[in-house]
Amino acid sequence: HFSIYFAKHGKDYDIDVAFGSFGENPIGMQDKMTSIDVLRMAENLRCKVVVPIHWDVWTNFQADCEEIKLLYDFKKDRNEYKFHPFFWQVGGKYVYPQDKDKIYFHHRRGFEDCFEAPQNIPYRSCL
């Protein structure tokens, strides 16, 4: 959950990447941050990249990261954010600083090697 001590940690440490537990809390629960809390956390920590996590692994907490992107785009200029979000997928990876400018992870689409070897099918076209 959000903590006002994020601001202290942001002053005490140089943070490149911060992970924030993001989700839609059901009634009677408050352990995940909301979309605006994720942005507030990143701003308070003075990190360069914020990665929302856990938003897609619990069905009762499931959230949509596009909400963070929408709020980020709406507020980044006015609030002069010095960070940007990165949206991970389960099984994905993020390597800092190599991936520092990426916004989304996308699994490899495959088939980069198409037509590099003879086709091993009995017909020339695939419907």
Where are these regions (language model features)?
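Active-site-proximal loop/helix segments of hydrolase catalytic cores
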Residues: H1-L45
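Binuclear metal-ion centers of metallo-dependent hydrolases, dominated by the metallo-beta-lactamase
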Residues: K8-D12, S35-L127
